[in-house]
Amino acid sequence: MKTAAVAFYGAALVLLLAALKELLTGFEENRCSMTYMFEQPEYRRVVLPRRVSRLFPAYGLYLYGEGVYAQETRNLKLSGTPVLFLPGNAGSYKQARSLGSVALRKAENMEAGLHLNVFTVDFNEELVAFYGGSLLRQTHFLHECIKAVLRLYKNLKVPPRNVALVGHSMGGVVARALFTLPRFNPRLVSLIVTQASPHVAPVLALDPYLLEFYVAVRQKWSTQAQKLRNVTVLSVGGGYRDYQVRSGLTSLPCPPGDPNKLALVATAVPRTWLSTDHLSIVWCKELVLATVRALFDLVDPETRQLTDDPERKRAVLNHHFVRHPARTPQDAADPSVSMPDVPEAWSEVNTLRLSYRTPKEGQLKYFLFALSSRRRAYSHFYCRSSSLESSSWVLGCVRTAGSSCASAVDLSSGTELLPPYKVLVLSLSDLSSFTHLVVSASNLSGKQFTVECEWQREAAQTLSVSVPHLLSFGFSVGEVTVNSSGLLHQVQLLHFHQVYQAFRISVVSSCRGNADRLPSVYRLRVPWFREDSFTTASVPSASEISGMLHTSRPGNFSNVLLQLHTAPNCQYKVSIRTSFPKVLGQVLRFCGPMVPVYTAVTLLLACRGQLCSILRSGRAADMMQVVSAGLQPHQVLLPVYLLHVLLSCSCLQDISSVLGLPPEDTLPPTFPDGVEGAESHEEWPHLLSPLLYVLGAAVAFWGSALLRLLIRLVSLFLAPLHRPSVSRTSGTLSLQTQFLLGVCLYAAAWMFCGALAIFTSCLLHLYRVLRLQMTERSLGHMLNLAPNKRKVTANGAPEAEPQSGTSPRGGAPLLSEGALQEVRDDLQLHLSLMPLLILPVMLSAPSLIHWSRNLRFSTRLDPDPWWLHSVMLASVYLLLINATVSKLSISRLLPVISRLPLPLAVTMATFSSLHLYRLAYFLEAVLVPLAFCFIF
């Protein structure tokens, strides 16, 4: 193998490892606080009807409890508001303990005994993210659970009519799938909260049932959106720490403008402001508190049920998850405020900026800002306070009395909570009915805080900077300097609108003097999706922000903004550089499913190279040589792009639909679902195809090298268990044995699981490869020990070496280099085929795991997406066990079969980027004809 090939694939491996490192570790540390249980958690099993238990023996329903509450609810006599937790992929029903424990602690402080009854569903920790055959079964069981939960309250005077669902991961998708059931009453569920749930598309589509399930859910929520308008759905993504489900997939597929469907990222949630991984989003205290507070605020105290008022549900969820005004929703009921008539408490501010720190002693203090003299020169009024207590702190004065305000209207509802303080920005054009603004700085409790306010011109506070080009590799930099004469500045990041862009944004602050200042807050604001991120920094300091997007910008939205809540009299220097490792991480995050597709493409072309070598010379080439030659972008990517252009034509789309051909496969969209102006197809993944092909080829190359090494090592351990053999037929099967094994494998596929038959037949072929490796080693050792002397004829020439399998004077056959070469050829052929044979095993592994974990409930996998595949693949594996280069080289089918891999590779790259399970069809299209070569 050439050194250049090793160097190239070594560099490709470095790129892949850099992308993986950035994807798995290139984010902030886990800043979530742990939720603790103060008493022993208990899970009380709810007895379900016998019919339900018989239909779903692997599933269960439990009530969460602790301490005294667990004892009080032992008989399941309940009076609270029902909340049902749904675990996700491989999730445990015990994950509800964080939600249940915090809800119990919250109920201790509630009046009138309001509390939540948290139920949790046991889905047997099934791998539903990769095996979709159980999703519909889980949906039906959830329907039965809801009916069983509501039956527990039938003795109450006013029993609850619906439940709230909290779903983690695939549990959130199952919650929305409830509405696809023909007998489901939509009134049974009025609120769904999902955590890190991939609503847009599955992370990996490894079987058709998974995609069929998603299509049914999307179609239901799209076609009957008006009927489901009163169902409130909140979807929370984890952010960049969640590398399993990217946050763009958590957006909700719904019509634009539906106010009852809300999707956001945890970094944008008030009082959370952090990223969570896929598991910690369930127990992250900051997020659990927001969820529990919202659930309690949604309970009607009179009926003890979740409110049916869509306006109230929307207001509560916006309050806790979108824009927290540092006050409770009940405080905003009456905006009219009577002001105290205490002249010494009032001060009129005539300067452009106010900076005030309250004394340690409690006092009443109000500042009065006249509006009449500021309307023409300024556009906004900005104010912030480090007091996070709930209060009416900014008011519009309606009637003045001397130097004080007699009557005012509360304007604090527009307050936004930031990590270190609360902020309010008022547009002067909206304040025409007021004469003055009043800012309250009263600290009757004696707790010190700081208030800073100023008049602002929005145009003067907004700057623009173009981000560097993607291929600048960090050498070019976009810079802007903010000489802070104000408290708020905005920097528009021009041309930053695609998910494959990634930047390191550095903000360096320097100040004059050593005065105490409030910390600065840097907010990366994305207008088209709630994925804002916040960075808090002391002054002076140097901070670095990761500039990346979870979603691409639709066409009708403004630019990304970097908001700087700054300290006065300080200078801020903003530098933006492209981060190549982060770009690689983004490429893998959004286009990762294409890597295994191009790995399969490389292995197919490697098989083509091996077949062409046998056809041309009758000898098998080295496995690593043909795999290294499998990277042929000019023969694959150009036809793929031409197919993409052709299939984009409407006339060809009509023809393909008439012929029943599938549409071109595309990755899930990166635009937020349900946003106007989003394009249906994106072109940038085609531009990244060469990079993805290189990464896929690197996986194929180094994976094949690892497989070759493992086969050598395993054969060393197995050699003492086998008698040394010098025959190339070692490990082969007789026709009768092949027939018996085939019958057993078909029976296993029918009675148990198709993936089991595929896995077993692959092991049989692996054993053949191991025996060939042992034979090759034995022959090599024997030939090295044999004497090298040759007899000399009468004319002085050396006597010709006997052919393999012949012997002088009719004796036993002598070993020769020819015999060793034949074994080596067969070994290289099988080594080249082995990665292709392993791919279906890897694709079917989730089905096999699901079947093995459910053996105590059912011995047969139903439905089985791999049953038909197992019949063909098991037959192919058994036939290929006896494959030899000599048989293949004389086959009349070889010239035709050697031409199949290239068009199949092009078709595979076109139609398998989303439907990964289609890889099996293309592999069978090559392997089945190849197996026929050893029959005819």
Predicted feature descriptions by range:
Residues 84-90, 104, 108-110, 116-244, ...:
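Serine-dependent carboxylesterase/thioesterase catalytic core
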Residues 188, 204, 213-224, 228-348, ...:
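Eukaryote-biased recognition of electropositive, low-complexity segments
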Residues 1-13, 630-631, 732, 896:
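Classical eukaryotic N-terminal signal peptides for Sec-dependent ER targeting/secretion
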Residues 22-33, 95-102, 131-137, 177-181, ...:
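Short coil/turn segments at secondary-structure boundaries
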Residues 24-27, 32, 62-128:
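Short, surface-exposed "cap/lid" segments of acyl-processing enzymes
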Residues 328-590, 598:
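Preference for solvent-exposed, low-hydrophobicity sequence contexts
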Residues 14-40, 219-227:
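Membrane-interface motif at the C-terminal end of an N-terminal transmembrane signal
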Residues 573-936:
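Alpha-helical transmembrane segments of integral membrane proteins
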